[in-house]
């Protein structure tokens, strides 16, 4: 007995630590088109099973509908106008987060907390030293099932440390060219699907009838929209098979009930009217959390959460968050980290200090159907590519939503793949008065300075109340909230209130 007693605390510690694993799944340009969100045609049994066994958030939002900028918010807990990732990371004319974000970066903080960290799939943000993982796994980001198989050895490694796996698909992002098999002059994009109805290795591809696809109200109900949506749904169904494989690996390894699983997307689907906008269709994302330690399951929550909440939540789950200060417990100041690292230019380190997260942990509200989180939400978009400058700032309080189009007067810029899409081009060639969903082509391109919507009555933002004198007090109140947010988060574009 005297031999065993000293080892009991050690064994308990190892067992507990090894249980607090995290898998964070982020898809690429996916709206809540899932069975668990009521979509009538989606094939998503694996994701649906996570919802049945966890908490599904009905009001979860990205803070920007652009890939790199959104991913920087996900992995820093900071709005992109503050972390420096103003737009896309790729190409020579790229953006990158400020180096001082290293103090709050999710993979860095979890590594400091004793996690082994791994990444597979799409990365698409910079600098790597700020968002560094211990292990980078190589997999086909268009084949989530193969990605899961590649990640198996990392997940099941014989290691007393808990793991954090960042699992990022490239589906259902546009890509792979256009499908020439469709009739007409405008061909749908493949959305990563293979030509001639071929299948990725190990995947049972699911094909959708364009005539049976539900067309969301922000899109025109045209053959072009339907054919592209059919490819989009196929790409989403492929993701689900990868998640099923992940779940299988976890269960076979006795890790399913020791692993937090989060499923979301960087922002809404890759169609004009959604991606790169701050409209509902651009920011509303699927968000499901399965916490194995939460007894209440199958919960649908109407609490408002955002991508800025992700990093503090996962750090909180790892018991590494100082909730009072909203910062890591073992906080490593950025200046201390970069000391003696002269290769990092001091003029690119960003704001001082980076000491706390903009978002808040949702761990305490998991399993609580009637819990609230944020009363007011904010979104911030500035660039997509560097040539696609159109800063927008947004605030909504559950009833009213204000959009400030800072560059109003300039034509609204398009992501190149959205501009080239058959869905958009088919309407564009009909002229400015042609309807694109609930907007005209012309009104989509030429935006007013302010847009005010009652989102409880007008979810998809058809009726702009900003110029209605009956709503002048509400407009000014929302402007004040937006200014306060910009001031609190050191938004450089706050100066535009005064100078433009």
Residue ranges and their predicted role:
Residues 2-12:
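Bacterial N-terminal signal peptides
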Residues 18-23, 53-58, 112-118, 159-165, ...:
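Loop/turn elements at helix/coil->beta-strand transitions in domains of secreted/extracellular proteins
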Residues 24-27, 31-121, 125-138:
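Active-site segment of extracytoplasmic enzymes that catalyze sulfate/phosphate-ester chemistry
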Residues 30, 54-55, 64, 78-82, ...:
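A generic secondary-structure signal for well-formed alpha-helical elements
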Residues 32-36, 59, 82-83, 174-176, ...:
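Short, solvent-exposed loop/turn elements at domain surfaces
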Residues 118, 134-157, 162:
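Acidic, His- and aromatic-enriched active-site or binding-groove loops in soluble protein domains
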Residues 359-367, 374-377:
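Polar, glycine-rich mid-to-C-terminal structural blocks
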């Amino acid at each position: 007995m005297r031999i065993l007693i000293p080892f009991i605390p050690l064994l308990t510690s190892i067992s507990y630590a090894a249980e607090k694993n995290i898998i964070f799944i982020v898809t690429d340009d996916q709206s809540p088109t899932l069975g668990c969100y009521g979509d009538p045609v989606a094939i998503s049994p694996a994701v649906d099973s996570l919802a049945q066994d966890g908490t599904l958030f009905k009001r979860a939002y990205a803070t920007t509908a652009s890939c790199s900028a959104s991913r920087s918010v996900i992995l820093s807990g900071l709005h992109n106008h503050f972390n420096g990732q103003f737009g896309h990371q790729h190409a020579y004319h790229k953006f990158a987060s400020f180096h001082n974000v290293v103090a709050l970066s999710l993979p860095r903080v979890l590594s400091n907390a004793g996690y082994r960290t791994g990444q597979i799939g799409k990365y698409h943000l910079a600098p790597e030293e700020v968002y560094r993982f211990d292990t980078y796994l190589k997999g086909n980001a268009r084949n989530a099932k193969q990605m899961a198989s590649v990640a198996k050895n990392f997940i099941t490694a014989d290691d007393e440390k808990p793991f954090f796996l960042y699992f990022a698909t490239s589906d259902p992002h546009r890509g792979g060219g256009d499908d020439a098999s469709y009739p007409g002059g405008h061909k749908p994009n493949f959305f990563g699907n293979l030509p001639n109805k071929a299948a990725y290795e190990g995947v049972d591809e699911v094909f959708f009838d364009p005539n049976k696809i539900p067309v969301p109200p922000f899109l025109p109900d045209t053959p072009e929209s339907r054919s592209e949506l059919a490819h989009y749904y196929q790409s989403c169904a492929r993701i689900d098979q990868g998640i099923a494989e992940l779940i299988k690996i976890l269960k076979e390894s006795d890790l399913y009930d020791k692993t937090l699983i989060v499923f979301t997307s960087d922002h809404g689907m890759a169609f004009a009217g959604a991606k790169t906008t701050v409209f509902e269709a651009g920011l509303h994302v699927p968000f499901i959390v399965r916490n194995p330690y939460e007894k209440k399951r199958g919960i649908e929550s109407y609490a408002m959460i955002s991508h800025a909440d992700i990093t503090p939540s996962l750090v909180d789950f790892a018991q590494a968050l100082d909730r009072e200060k909203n910062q890591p417990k073992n906080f490593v100041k950025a200046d201390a980290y970069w000391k003696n690292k002269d290769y990092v230019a001091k003029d690119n380190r960003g704001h001082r200090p980076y000491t706390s997260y903009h978002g808040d942990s949702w761990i305490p509200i998991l399993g609580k159907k009637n819990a609230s989180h944020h009363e007011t939400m904010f979104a911030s978009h500035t660039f997509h590519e560097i040539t696609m400058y159109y800063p927008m700032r947004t605030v909504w309080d559950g009833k009213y939503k204000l959009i400030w189009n800072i560059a109003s007067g300039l034509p609204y810029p398009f992501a190149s793949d959205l501009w080239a899409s058959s869905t958009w081009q088919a309407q564009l060639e009909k002229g400015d008065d042609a309807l694109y969903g609930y907007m005209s082509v012309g009104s989509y391109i030429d935006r007013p300075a302010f847009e005010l919507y009652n989102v409880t009555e007008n979810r998809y933002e058809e009726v702009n109340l900003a110029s209605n004198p009956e709503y002048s007090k509400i407009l000014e109140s929302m402007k004040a909230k937006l200014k306060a947010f910009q001031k609190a988060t050191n938004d450089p574009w706050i100066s535009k209130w005064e100078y433009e």
